[in-house]
Amino acid sequence: MRADGNLTQWAAPGFPDDTLLLRDIARGGGFVIESVIPSEAKESLVAYFALLPSPEPTYDYIDGAWLTDAPYGVIHRMASYPDVHGIFTAVLDFAAARYAHLRIDTHRDNHIMQHLIEKHNFTYCGIIWLEDGTERLAYER
């Protein structure tokens, strides 16, 4: 993220930390993806994401409007190895098989994630705020 100009998202040392990831896993929503890293030619852990059921407390207030009030799945903490392609598509396929409606948010400076979100037919819905007061761009499909 830093190399692409996103200097502030996940800037806190150790974020996301083990406690948060273990909480995702305990809720049945922490997932890893294994694949072959081209430069290493061996199977490795290449991505992590959380797919959690609604409600998401930080989505209760939005400066804008959600597309629906129906139950949804929310994708959080999407992180992947940069040289392995197709991860986001695989995550969305996995999520869409489980939820009719999906929501996701990202940092204003995370242009790569914004591009991927919009490319995969999400609609920009507005701005939400995290518990620490930082804003995120929010999307739904």
Where are these regions (language model features)?
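Conserved acyl-donor/pantetheine-binding loop and adjacent beta-alpha core of acyl/acetyltransferases
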Residues: A50-D83
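Conserved GNAT acetyl-CoA-binding A-motif
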Residues: V74, A97-D109
